[in-house]
Amino acid sequence: MQSLQQNIETAFEQRAAITPANVDATTRDAVNQVIAALDSGTLRVAEKINGEWVTHQWLKKAVLLSFRIADNQLIEGGETRFFDKVPMKFAGWDSERFQREGFRVVPPASVRQGAYIARNTVLMPSYVNIGAYVDESTMVDTWATVGSCAQIGKNVHLSGGAGIGGVLEPLQANPTIIEDNCFIGARSEMVEGVIVEEGSVISMGVFIGQSTKIYDRETGEVHYGRVPAGSVVVSGNLPSKDGRYSLYCAVIVKKVDAKTRGKVGINELLRTID
């Protein structure tokens, strides 16, 4: 693994000069190995180690290099065609392969090669980009988007039109992470490496980036870039110091534990916020 990482790091330093025509065999093989490992879930761009999320930047570099070494090619897609550098994950799959992998894909859902989809996941007509990791028993609902290298936990529901941001550019950014047992409401957007911690419920139409204030109304505390575990979050506003205007924020209206969440439906949690 160390030699593979070194090959990627070395090639990335020379990326501006690399083209599909001149890429050397060592670099091509290293990039292809990484993409295959991301595709199978053997490697992932970020993982939780000792309670903290760690981003493996070299894997993101490999994903970026994959665009340097590939020409656009014709991609068949049912009644239409596409033209891109990255093949589709399910190209060439037959019924037996889908049954073996153990998840459902509803047309016209699109998943790029290099994204991992775990068992018992349901992909409605949605989009999952390269480098993403979608864990077991998750629902990616209609028109939801899982961006490049985003990490989605177990038993997550990404509602219709929800967007989970990708982070290949800028490279130093960490991936957006949705931990286990979270609910992301319709048309909400979590971007710029935001972490939504385990068991949180995000209401419809909530937008959170690194600069978004996440206001806990019970404590008055303001968080940035992280939704604490078990939070129920809605969109809101905070007044300016002089009271002349207000600016958008996300508001933590309550905290719930796993026991409460198991007994109470998501809709009820969001309706009883007063």
From Swiss-Prot:
Chain residues that bind substrate: R104, D141
Gene Ontology CC terms, in alphabetical order: cytoplasm
InterPro entries reported in the protein's UniProt record: DapD_Trfase_Hexpep_rpt_fam, Hexapep, THP_succinylTrfase_dom1, THP_succinylTrfase_N_sf, Trimer_LpxA-like_sf
A GO term for molecular function: 2,3,4,5-tetrahydropyridine-2,6-dicarboxylate N-succinyltransferase activity
Key word Hydrolase present: no
EC number: 2.3.1.117
Assembly and interaction partners: Homotrimer.
Pfam families per record: Hexapep_2, THDPS_N_2
Disulfide topology: none
Highest taxon in the source lineage: Bacteria
Family: Belongs to the transferase hexapeptide repeat family.
PANTHER family hit by this protein: 2,3,4,5-TETRAHYDROPYRIDINE-2,6-DICARBOXYLATE N-SUCCINYLTRANSFERASE, MOLYBDENUM COFACTOR GUANYLYLTRANSFERASE
Protein known as: 2,3,4,5-tetrahydropyridine-2,6-dicarboxylate N-succinyltransferase
Catalytic reaction equation(s): (S)-2,3,4,5-tetrahydrodipicolinate + succinyl-CoA + H2O = (S)-2-succinylamino-6-oxoheptanedioate + CoA
Subcellular localization, as worded in the UniProt entry: Cytoplasm
GO BP annotation list: diaminopimelate biosynthetic process; lysine biosynthetic process via diaminopimelate
Involved pathway(s): Amino-acid biosynthesis; L-lysine biosynthesis via DAP pathway; LL-2,6-diaminopimelate from (S)-tetrahydrodipicolinate (succinylase route): step 1/3
Keywords: Acyltransferase, Amino-acid biosynthesis, Cytoplasm, Diaminopimelate biosynthesis, Lysine biosynthesis, Repeat, Transferase
